[in-house]
């Protein structure tokens, strides 16, 4: 190890600091470096069955429901996802459990001893996850693509089933600035003669062409399967199966429906009872999540106010226009049942399309509190306010120096019947969650 001697027993924080500096570029897409190490360590086939999940939004919730279903079926399951909210350990789950620091540091040491050249943070962590999965002797692993697909580190593994959640404009510096270019990159996770499930209703031709080239069996939303909802429940069906009176769940319905489509291609005889149970159980932090009693009490203690005075508070990690569109639909439905204002606490990274986000949400948000995020990618609250007012000059917007400053300002102006939304980035939700968790 250059310039730094770390051991398996070194603290996890030291290892993560090393990983962040171990390659000259934080993001360096390509598979040659990581694949050579994976081949050396026999990590390309870590478990009998692999599902890879790609897409612009919805990957995390899709992975979570797949995981819940497979666990309820009695299988040994691992999940690799990113980014984490509070702790690195969230990125690797085995049997629905985060692993202790010691497991990660030992795995990092093993990878570091065997690497032949420098690796990026994500390459290093991907190899470590595969090593941990192989050691655990699992039945199934679910890999969440980090960025794009074709050149993403997770793509060194040949999956048996590929799932695409959605396709929209994001990460244009790396993936291209059109849906067609982005779809081509995401289709890089497809494998010859392996099934592909697509939850995006408007699929670019570049993705379909890639599937045809590889002779993939494709299951497309609204073509090969569909779902519909009413006030009390929802239904899902394809040409062979119809599931009726399904319970609503804590994740977006489109993602849940995509998972039900994916289940049809799994080599496991999963019962309808297991599917229904899993829909009722599934949840994931930061996905249009209302803050519940215990966390409301912690927030009230932090603020020094009576808990009963707090308004409804919702957190969401949505950070691009596609996610903002979904948010606006949820908030519009919610607004019909409340008497108060919609107040937003928004923090975003510099490389995100803030104007596209604002376009979807300004019609529904009454009051904005823009906050500064730290780090080299963080955007200041002043910059966000300037963007807001340049397009919507009459908007009510203020700037704060941190997420919690923004939350405090928002709550001072809020009354019991209002709704406060904390959103814009994983970083935004993480700062808030660290206070209430």
UniProtKB/Swiss-Prot annotation:
Keywords (alphabetical) are: ATP-binding, Folate biosynthesis, Ligase, Magnesium, Metal-binding, Nucleotide-binding, One-carbon metabolism
Question: Which positions are annotated as binding Mg(2+) 1?
Answer: 82, 144
Any signal peptide, and if so, which residues?
Answer: none
Q: Which enzyme type, at the first EC level?
A: ligase
Q: Does the keyword ATP-binding apply?
A: yes
Which residues does the record give as 7,8-dihydropteroate binding sites? 28-30, 120-123, 151-153
Q: What is its EC number?
A: 6.3.2.12, 6.3.2.17
Any Pfam family the entry gives: Mur_ligase_C
The coenzyme or cofactor needed here is: Mg(2+)
Instruction: Please indicate if the UniProt record lists ATP-binding as a keyword.
Output: yes
Which reaction is the catalytic activity of this chain? 7,8-dihydropteroate + L-glutamate + ATP = 7,8-dihydrofolate + ADP + phosphate + H(+); (6S)-5,6,7,8-tetrahydrofolyl-(gamma-L-Glu)(n) + L-glutamate + ATP = (6S)-5,6,7,8-tetrahydrofolyl-(gamma-L-Glu)(n+1) + ADP + phosphate + H(+); 10-formyltetrahydrofolyl-(gamma-L-Glu)(n) + L-glutamate + ATP = 10-formyltetrahydrofolyl-(gamma-L-Glu)(n+1) + ADP + phosphate + H(+); (6R)-5,10-methylenetetrahydrofolyl-(gamma-L-Glu)(n) + L-glutamate + ATP = (6R)-5,10-methylenetetrahydrofolyl-(gamma-L-Glu)(n+1) + ADP + phosphate + H(+)
Q: Name one GO molecular function term.
A: metal ion binding
A GO CC annotation recorded here is: cytoplasm
Q: Which residues bind Mg(2+) 2?
A: 171
Q: How is the cofactor bound?
A: Binds 2 Mg(2+) ions per subunit.
Q: Where does ATP bind?
A: 58-61, 255, 287, 316
Task: Classify the source by domain of life.
Answer: Bacteria
According to its UniProt record, in which pathway does this protein act?
A: Cofactor biosynthesis; tetrahydrofolate biosynthesis; 7,8-dihydrofolate from 2-amino-4-hydroxy-6-hydroxymethyl-7,8-dihydropteridine diphosphate and 4-aminobenzoate: step 2/2; Cofactor biosynthesis; tetrahydrofolylpolyglutamate biosynthesis
Q: What does this protein do?
A: Functions in two distinct reactions of the de novo folate biosynthetic pathway. Catalyzes the addition of a glutamate residue to dihydropteroate (7,8-dihydropteroate or H2Pte) to form dihydrofolate (7,8-dihydrofolate monoglutamate or H2Pte-Glu). Also catalyzes successive additions of L-glutamate to tetrahydrofolate or 10-formyltetrahydrofolate or 5,10-methylenetetrahydrofolate, leading to folylpolyglutamate derivatives.
Assembly and oligomerization: Monomer.
Give the family, as the similarity comment puts it. Belongs to the folylpolyglutamate synthase family.
Write the protein's name: Dihydrofolate synthase/folylpolyglutamate synthase
Q: Which organism is it from?
A: Haemophilus influenzae (strain ATCC 51907 / DSM 11121 / KW20 / Rd)
